[in-house]
Curated annotation (Swiss-Prot):
May contribute to the regulation of translation during cell-cycle progression. May contribute to the regulation of cell proliferation. The membrane form is involved in sterol-regulated ubiquitination and degradation of HMG-CoA reductase HMGCR. May be involved in centrosome assembly. PANTHER family: PROTEIN C7ORF21, TRANSMEMBRANE AND UBIQUITIN-LIKE DOMAIN-CONTAINING PROTEIN 1. Keywords: Cytoplasm, Membrane, Nucleus, Transmembrane, Transmembrane helix. This is Transmembrane and ubiquitin-like domain-containing protein 1. InterPro entries: TMUB1/2, Ubiquitin-like_dom, Ubiquitin-like_domsf. SUPFAM superfamilies: Ubiquitin-like (SSF54236). Its main location: membrane. The gene is tmub1. Pfam families: ubiquitin. The keyword Cell cycle does not apply. It is found in: Membrane; Cytoplasm; Nucleus. PROSITE patterns: UBIQUITIN_2.
Amino acid sequence: MALIEGVGDEVTLLFGVVFLVLVLVLAWASTHTVEPPEHLLSPSPGASPSTETDSQEPLPPGNTDSSPGGVRDEDDKSEPGTEAGAAGQSADGSRAGGGDGGLLDDAGLGSDGLRHRESAGPSTHPPESTPSATQPSAEDAASDTHRNMVLRLKFLNDTERTAQVNPQDTIGYIKRTYFAGQEHQVRLIYQGQLLQDDSQTLASLNLADNSVLHCHISQHATRAMPAGARAADQVHVALNVGSLMVPLFVLMLSVLWYFQIQYRQFFTAPATASLVGITIFFSFVAFGVYRR
């Protein structure tokens, strides 16, 4: 039984939830207050004079004179060392280059030896993609040779279709291949026997080449449902959301009215008016439901 006659329970529940969300947003907007930003602490005036006096103190003349001289002396001392180090590095580099050249000459490789090895690589290793390219064609040919059995599918209006099958194919394979989308509506009959088990193979049914299968396509699919699915449907019917809607709204309104009475200072006039309107609307809905 629907909560409102002519309107589904899902629509009523959806509008109820949307209305509740709007009321909560309105209540939050009416009670929301913006706190003033805190004033930043200004720097203490006593600290600035000390910094200014420290920065304005002159450096002693001895330090100013000694620092450039010390820097020049260190530069003069470091220049011979750096020149000697650069000369040693150049000599080591020339010896290393000569050693590398000698090794390349002893090995019989030129400067482009790496390029010769890369160009010679494909010739020594033949491509491996050729066997894989020929393999699918061989499998297709094998599958075509295996499906050498022909079945005649005869309908009630005396029309026939031929099916290329394999003796190891199942009844379900024939339904999926030749009756796509109508698997649960097709009934296959062989020698007056209804073939209900889709896992049976053609060889187990003793179907020979050029055998006739009578096909019947029903308008309504009669699909067998397991016992667990039927039990789940019964539980779903027992736990109808419509029967829990009224107690849920009563509980929510009770909580809102409790907070409105205990914490009256947090509820503004628009929030209280919205709560009163929701209560009146829900009372009319509940009265209409229980009157029937």
